[in-house]
Amino acid sequence: MKTANFSFALCLSVVIMLFIKCTRSEQDLSVTKDAIAQKSGVTVSAVNLSNLIAYKNSDHQISAGYYRTWRDSATASGNLPSMRWLPDSLDMVMVFPDYTPPENAYWNTLKTNYVPYLHKRGTKVIITLGDLNSATTTGGQDSIGYSSWAKGIYDKWVGEYNLDGIDIDIESSPSGATLTKFVAATKALSKYFGPKSGTGKTFVYDTNQNPTNFFIQTAPRYNYVFLQAYGRSTTNLTTVSGLYAPYISMKQFLPGFSFYEENGYPGNYWNDVRYPQNGTGRAYDYARWQPATGKKGGVFSYAIERDAPLTSSNDNTLRAPNFRVTKDLIKIMNP
């Protein structure tokens, strides 16, 4: 890793500029800058942290992002991003854990480095569980079994990792016995996560579906509904948010877009962000959009670590993120 021979005074100024509250200007968050930040031991001032936390606790449209663990620098050599590079003004980061086995070094880095760092900035760290099949195919298929399964999730991700909540990804409309099991599993989870738990831990329902029978039966148990609106129009957002309106407040509703994933074209390609980055595209439309029945909860992104200066809409090069789009959207939603 290359480092520059800066004086201590210059190093100090770079670090302070990098970590002050809600940075919204464009920055090239290079590997060198991260090395300087970690080696210096300099932290954000108590005043700046206080202001940042106050912003996070205020009534505002939140920004959330799914972070792909297999592209983190702690996961494998050759990767560039670090969760410490995420914008300070990001409200919530979703740990998306594919291709990262339990023995990978990422998990210890998450627990001992990333989570404390992000918590100091008021950023919530949420684990993505995927669907609920693990509850319905393993262990006891009864209330005792579901309760044990849910407690195990809480003990691991809250007790061991000190995370702030969970995300379930439901991309189907379960029926019959599967519906019954999914509802029971969700009720078990809601004793530890969500507005009915009393724990303060967040429960996110992430979906690409209109309200299903499963959702209708479990709606009061979630803090947020994240709609995977990749490739859609704002007209569609208005329609779908109207379908959810009888069951949740619009402040709980967040539409989401996707950054371009490397090697995604043409099969996994949404064109939600225009490249080279120029401040336009579907993601910006989502930030400006509002439901017909109230203000939205915010916007989320998938593959947030791909918020980088790509040269084209199908640039497959792994590049260091600059988070320009994320910071632009935060500013649009909360001017």
Curated annotation (Swiss-Prot):
A Gene Ontology cellular-component term: extracellular region
Q: Which residues form the active site?
A: 171
- Which EC main class describes this enzyme? hydrolase
Q: How is it modified after translation?
A: Carbohydrates at Ser-73, Ser-89 and Ser-143 consist of (2-OMe)Man1-4GlcNAcU1-4GlcU1-4Glc1-4(2-OMe)GlcU1-4[(2-OMe)Rham1-2]Man.
Q: What is its EC number?
A: 3.2.1.96
- Which stretch is the leader sequence? 1-45
The glycosylation sites annotated in the UniProt record are 73, 89, 143
Q: Name one GO molecular function term.
A: mannosyl-glycoprotein endo-beta-N-acetylglucosaminidase activity
Specify the GH18 domain's residue ranges.
Answer: 61-321
Q: Which domain of life is it from?
A: Bacteria
Keyword annotations for this protein?
Answer: Glycoprotein, Glycosidase, Hydrolase, Secreted, Signal
What InterPro entries does this protein's entry cite? EndoS_F2-like_TIM-barrel, Glyco_hydro18_cat, Glyco_hydro_18_chit_AS, Glycoside_hydrolase_SF
Q: Name one GO biological process term.
A: carbohydrate metabolic process
Q: Where does the record say this protein resides?
A: Secreted
Concerning its family, UniProt says: Belongs to the glycosyl hydrolase 18 family.
Function of the protein: Endohydrolysis of the di-N-acetylchitobiosyl unit in high-mannose glycopeptides and glycoproteins. Complex biantennary glycans are the preferred substrates. Tri- and tetraantennary glycans are not hydrolyzed, and high mannose glycans are very poor substrates.
| Protein name in the entry | Endo-beta-N-acetylglucosaminidase F2
Q: Which species is this UniProt entry from?
A: Elizabethkingia meningoseptica
The opening ranks of the lineage are: Bacteria, Pseudomonadati, Bacteroidota, Flavobacteriia, Flavobacteriales
Gene symbol of the encoding locus? endOF2
